């Protein structure tokens, strides 16, 4: 019973860390990375479709993405979708390839993205703490129902706290890495 609670807490905390990684991937740094375009939706025959389903996104060099659109009639729609996204990118079409140069980040945008990264990290920390609270409440309920002793509850609570500390430490490391990436000129 105790192990199930700890395992569930660990899995949920792992998912929180994974979600933070996805959130950080969407925050643009000065470098080109295909995940930057993950949020772009293209109007494909009347339906909004993720860009990844209508084009192959590759990194041409450290500051340029290259898109190979599968359906040549979709080139204009893909270009428009990238321009109208809130990413601040200006694609350039060269034949059947769309190149997306990454503009250099200004100091102001770097600070804005750093602030956004900190907010995402804080949200992840709060989520991990909520998972800890849920796990501790489940342990307390077990102890009240006399399914486990007070000592077992205390030991399991300490284990949950260690797990929480470990995941919050990983969140801090991820945030430091993202901030360093953002501040690198």
From Swiss-Prot:
PANTHER family: MITOCHONDRIAL RIBOSOME RECYCLING FACTOR PSEUDO 1, RIBOSOME RECYCLING FACTOR. Responsible for the release of ribosomes from messenger RNA at the termination of protein biosynthesis. May increase the efficiency of translation by recycling ribosomes from one round of translation to another. Belongs to the RRF family. It comes from the Bacteria. It holds the Pfam family RRF. NCBIfam families: frr. The gene is frr. It is found in: Cytoplasm. Its main location: cytoplasm. This is Ribosome-recycling factor. GO terms for cellular component: cytoplasm; cytosol. HAMAP family: RRF. One of its GO terms (biological process) is translation. The keyword Protein biosynthesis applies. It comes from Pseudomonas aeruginosa (strain ATCC 15692 / DSM 22644 / CIP 104116 / JCM 14847 / LMG 12228 / 1C / PRS 101 / PAO1). GO terms for molecular function: ribosomal large subunit binding.
């Amino acid at each position: 019973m105790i192990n199930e609670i700890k395992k569930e807490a660990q899995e949920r905390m792992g998912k929180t860390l994974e979600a933070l990684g996805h959130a950080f991937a969407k925050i643009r740094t000065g470098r080109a990375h295909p995940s930057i375009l993950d949020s772009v939706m293209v109007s494909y025959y009347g339906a909004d479709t993720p860009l990844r389903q209508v084009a192959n996104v590759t990194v041409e060099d450290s500051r340029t993405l290259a898109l190979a659109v599968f359906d040549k009639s979709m080139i204009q729609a893909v270009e428009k979708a990238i321009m109208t996204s809130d990413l601040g990118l200006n694609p350039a079409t060269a034949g059947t390839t769309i190149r997306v140069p990454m503009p250099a980040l200004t100091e102001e945008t770097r600070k804005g993205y750093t602030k956004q990264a900190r907010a995402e990290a804080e949200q992840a920390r709060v989520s991990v703490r909520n998972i800890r609270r849920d796990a501790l409440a489940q342990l307390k309920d077990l102890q009240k129902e006399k399914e486990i002793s007070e000592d077992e509850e205390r030991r399991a609570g300490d284990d949950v706290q260690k797990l929480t500390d470990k995941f919050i430490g990983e969140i801090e490391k991820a945030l430091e890495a993202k901030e360093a990436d953002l501040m690198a000129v």
